A protein has these predicted regions:
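Predominantly flavin-linked oxidoreductase catalytic cores and closely associated redox partners
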Residues: 105-235
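Glycine-rich FAD pyrophosphate-binding loop
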Residues: 9, 20-43
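Redox-cofactor binding/interface segments in oxidoreductases and associated redox assembly factors
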Residues: 9, 144-145, 265
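A conserved beta-strand/loop capping segment in the N-terminal third of enzymes
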Residues: 52, 56-103, 124
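FAD/FMN-dependent oxidoreductases across multiple families
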Residues: 213-294
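Residue-level detector of alpha-helix initiation sites
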Residues: 12-13, 37-38, 282
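Beta1/beta-strand and adjacent pyrophosphate-binding region of the FAD-binding site
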Residues: 1-14
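C-terminal helical "tail/cap" subdomain of flavin- and related membrane-associated enzymes
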Residues: 293-376
Length: 376
């Protein structure tokens, strides 16, 4: 089995960003995507300013793809509402459109893209993967970018977590003019929902909720949430959406501290930030770009150093996002948060800035490679 120079498992933003940067650096990158074509994803409709900057550096113009500009955050808890200006311009874009643009860009700059191929297992010692048809492929380096999905042989170690993972749900609602330029965050017990306009004018609804609240099923959960969040219920016209996409076992706050030689864990395989912070896509793009640049400058042996640096870099933003998520999970914390933001709205912008993980790559001085632009 002859290895390829760089093997990337996962065709989402992290994997595609890594493939683009590797191809630009002259590294023959092979990107494996389990989806044969365009598809939706539960998370990732919000593009913060740092994600937009990273996309521009990758050669993707989100606004040209139809992304809807967002300049304000509308935070709702029960009947209470606070509206705040974001510190910089953001946008809303479906993952279907974003992922296709990134994969197309990776192919255009020279990466080999294999679509519709499901990877069943990995061998970290050999930096190899096995497809569901038994075929195997090895890489000089293996970039793990499978998002929230585990890969046998390289599954994330979640055994030391004190908190059970959360569940994510996504549905599409009819758009309305009052969502223009705004992302709405609806807070309720042990969860929250985000609502924004997509490029086609529909509204993307994403919910994060403690997994135990799903014990009675989605219909029962949504009935409870609509009672707790009447303004969200009004957005849904009092009716449950006909279709939900779901993912279970989302370990918010998790970060990997170490990796095997030649294995780069990027995106949610390296660090999982609460979606309340809106930084998931930026972290995916930034980690993919940074890891690719580190590999191009330092080879497979730089993986362990890079992973440790990314762990340190993401510690404070993810810690702050976790504090906000946990604080908003209960009625006392939500009430305090809403009062603080009403009295001192500047705190919202400051919190948004503190939960960002810069797209600028780690280890840039040691590898000598060019850094990706991003906010300081």
């Amino acid at each position: 089995m002859r290895p390829v120079p760089a093997l990337i498992v996962g065709g989402g933003p992290a994997g595609a960003a890594a493939a683009i940067m590797l191809a630009r650096a002259g590294v023959a990158a092979h990107l494996i995507d389990r989806h044969a074509g365009p598809h939706e994803s539960v998370c990732g409709g919000f593009l913060g300013w740092d994600a937009l900057a990273a996309l521009r550096d990758l050669g993707v113009d989100a606004l040209a793809l139809g992304a809807r500009p967002i300049g304000r955050l509308r935070l709702l808890s029960g009947e209470r509402c606070v509206e705040l200006a974001l510190p910089h311009a953001a946008a809303g874009l479906s993952r279907r459109v974003l992922d296709e643009a990134l994969i197309g860009r990776a192919r255009a700059v020279g990466a080999t893209v294999l679509r519709g191929r499901a990877v069943r297992a990995a061998d970290p010692a050999g930096r190899s993967i096995r497809f569901d048809d038994g075929e195997e492929l090895a890489g000089g380096a293996l970039f793990l970018a499978t998002g929230k999905h585990e890969l046998r042989g390289l599954a994330r170690d979640l055994g030391q977590r004190r908190e059970a993972p959360c569940a994510g749900l996504r549905a599409v609602l009819p758009g309305c003019p009052t969502l223009a330029g705004v992302i709405e965050m609806h807070l309720f017990d042990r969860g929250y929902a985000g609502l924004l306009l997509q490029e086609d004018g529909s509204a993307n609804l994403c919910l994060s909720v403690a997994r135990e609240r799903l014990a009675g099923g989605v219909a029962a959960l949504m009935a409870e949430i609509m009672a707790e969040a009447p303004r969200l219920a009004a957005r849904m016209d009092g009716k449950m959406p006909a279709h939900f996409e779901a993912i279970a076992g989302v370990p918010y706050g998790w970060r990997v501290a170490a990796t095997a030689p030649g294995i780069f864990r990027i995106g949610d395989q390296g660090a999982v930030i609460a979606s309340l912070a809106g930084d998931g896509i930026a972290i995916a793009l930034g980690s993919g770009m940074s890891a690719a640049q580190t590999f191009a400058g330092g080879g497979p042996e730089a993986a362990e150093r890079w992973q440790a640096q990314w762990h340190r870099r993401s510690r404070r933003p993810i810690g702050i996002a976790e504090a906000l998520r946990r604080g908003a999970a209960g009625p006392v914390g939500r009430a305090l948060l809403m009062r603080l933001l009403r009295w001192m709205p500047g705190l919202g912008a400051q919190a948004a800035l503190l939960t960002r993980v810069s797209a600028r790559r780690t280890g840039e001085r040691r590898s000598g490679a060019r850094s990706a632009p991003g906010p300081d």
